[in-house]
């Protein structure tokens, strides 16, 4: 899911410049708007879904739903590649990623097998998240080069987000050793 998020966010400026043909100054201003919209929705989703998750305990469902919302952002922009839809996609991506990053981490913590290794295990979770942010832009650049446009980047972002949801849906609680 982090790769899907990185595919969408890391290439926004290039999409505005080369996908939508915006002049450099306009694209830079619009990138700022996209970042603000994305960030506002990340914060809102993080807080709200964190509270809902704590109250209901239904972390798996919320985490999977977050991946579907994030995937919807990729589908939306692939189908309607306009700046207006890019704003909608940024909001959806922010909602999905904010919810996923908060509730997904809580869900991952619930799945940790041994209390004495929680810090190590959460370190591994953090490394995988960081790798997703590293891999996304490189993969995205390759996909743009492959098809000469951005549609495949957004489709891949949607697919990878859904794969993250499927993996979450089938994650199993381990047998605790302590």
Regions inferred by a protein language model and the residue ranges of each:
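Helix-loop junctions at membrane interfaces in 12-TM secondary transporters
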Residues: 78-89
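Multi-pass alpha-helical transporter architecture, strongest
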Residues: 155-178
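A membrane-interface helix-boundary motif in multi-pass transporters
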Residues: 140-161
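Helix-to-loop junctions at the C-terminal end of transmembrane segments
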Residues: 44-58
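Intracellular juxtamembrane helix-capping segments at the cytosolic ends
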Residues: 99-113
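A late C-terminal transmembrane helix in Major Facilitator Superfamily
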Residues: 116-146
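Short amphipathic helix-loop junctions that connect adjacent transmembrane helices
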Residues: 10-29
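Structural signature of the two symmetry-related core transmembrane helices
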Residues: 61-76
């Amino acid at each position: 899911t982090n790769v899907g998020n990185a595919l969408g966010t890391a290439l926004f400026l290039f999409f505005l410049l080369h996908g939508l043909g915006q002049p450099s100054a306009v694209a830079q201003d619009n990138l700022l708007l996209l970042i603000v919209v994305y960030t506002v929705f990340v914060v809102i989703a993080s807080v709200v879904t964190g509270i809902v998750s704590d109250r209901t305990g239904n972390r798996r469902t919320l985490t999977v739903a977050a991946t579907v919302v994030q995937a919807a952002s990729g589908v939306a922009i692939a189908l309607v590649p306009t700046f207006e839809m890019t704003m909608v996609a940024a909001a959806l991506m922010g909602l999905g990623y904010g919810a996923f990053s908060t509730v997904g981490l809580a869900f991952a913590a619930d799945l940790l097998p041994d209390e004495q290794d929680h810090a190590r295990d959460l370190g591994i979770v953090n490394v995988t998240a960081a790798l997703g942010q590293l891999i996304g832009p490189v993969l995205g650049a390759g996909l743009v080069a492959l098809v000469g446009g951005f549609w495949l980047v957004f489709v891949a972002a949607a697919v990878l987000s859904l794969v993250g949801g499927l993996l979450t849906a089938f994650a199993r609680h381990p047998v605790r050793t302590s």
